[in-house]
Amino acid sequence: MSYLKFDKNLMINLEQSLPKEMLRTNQAGAYHCTTIVDCNTRKQHGLLVVPIPEMGNSWHVMLSSLDETVYQHGAPFNLGLHRYSGGVMSPNGHKYIREFDCESVPRTTYRVGGVILTKEKIFISNENRILIRYTLVEAHSATTLRFRPVLAFREANELCIANDTLNTEIPEIDNGVSACLYKGYPRLFMQFSHKPSWTYDPHWYNGFEYVKDLERGVPYTEDLWVPGYFEVPIKKGESIIFSAGLSEVSPRSLARMYEKEIAQRTCRTSFFNCLKNAVKQCYLKDHESMYLLSGYPWGKTLARNTFMALPGATIAINHREDFEKIMSTALKALRNFMKTGELDRRIMGIDLPDNPLWAVWALQQYAKAYSREEASAKYLSDIR
């Protein structure tokens, strides 16, 4: 039984569904964050948000959303939802939602007439790639799906205004297209497991509003560019996988990649498992180093917070190896500062005077959980 499940009555009531946000991360710094009805309510929301090392490792929204449309008998049924200037909600795709479930991955079930369509999203671990699997559960006639990618290519705390400086070239690749709107950004690759038709139809969509930013009294309106749309016919019982990432992938590998990733997920069948999933999303791996983020989408890696939260974020959920990796990275930065006075490029606040005390406290929790002998053998040389 799923611990996180919302029915139609809650989903179509925006007063109840819009405040509920979800976060997916890849433990490499990238994330996907939006509401459970896929309507972005903060400028930091997006389908694919990645850190860019060449830009100071700050987060950048690459793909804001992917708007789906179901076509039957030539009639379109739009599943997307956005808030535009003046508080106008369009195209009100939430009215087709029948259920939202998040046992292993977020899954939204839509019903449009005789069509039942499910959408499941999953982030690939340690890779800047998100996969979305669409499955046509039921249909009584020929069905086609249309997808409009809404591109941003901006820093997560900034907003985009319609301009003529963007690169409008959208070259086609294997089962998809790629885009790089501005100089200095990596290329975004959008591909499908099935061969789609691509129609280049570029337009600026103006006046997106982010209600959470409006409530905070900060800038909240932007314009986003849509280069065109994909169309893919789909049959009853068939699944189509969409991939958005910073590298090209073989379309044939998408189904295998999806199944491999979902097998590693912890099912949210209890409150404890929900907490485990939540804290593991704050792990950050960078080559041989490992960090603990203070949170998304604003959190950084802070030295004091790392030492304070580390036992609860690792030992409490039986992740001893992750404790040791994160502690090793943090102690290395702390020792380097104490010897040279140099600040760490990734861990902020390493120069605070109480960091050594919190580090020792975290090691004491490690000793309590395992043994003083093991803790001494592993860490005594670091604290002398």
List the model feature ranges, each with a label.
Residues 260-296:
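Conserved oxyanion/phosphate-binding beta-strand-loop segments in alpha/beta enzyme cores
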Residues 209-216, 276-289, 329-339:
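Active-site-adjacent bridging/hinge elements
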Residues 138-139, 160-163, 234-236, 300, ...:
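Aromatic-rich carbohydrate-recognition surfaces in CAZymes
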Residues 124, 270, 287, 299-304:
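Short helix-capping and inter-helix turn/linker motifs at the boundaries of alpha-helical repeat units
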Residues 145, 273-277, 357:
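Non-catalytic, well-ordered alpha-helical scaffold segments
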Residues 1-267, 297, 319, 331, ...:
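Terminal accessory carbohydrate-recognition/targeting modules of carbohydrate-active enzymes
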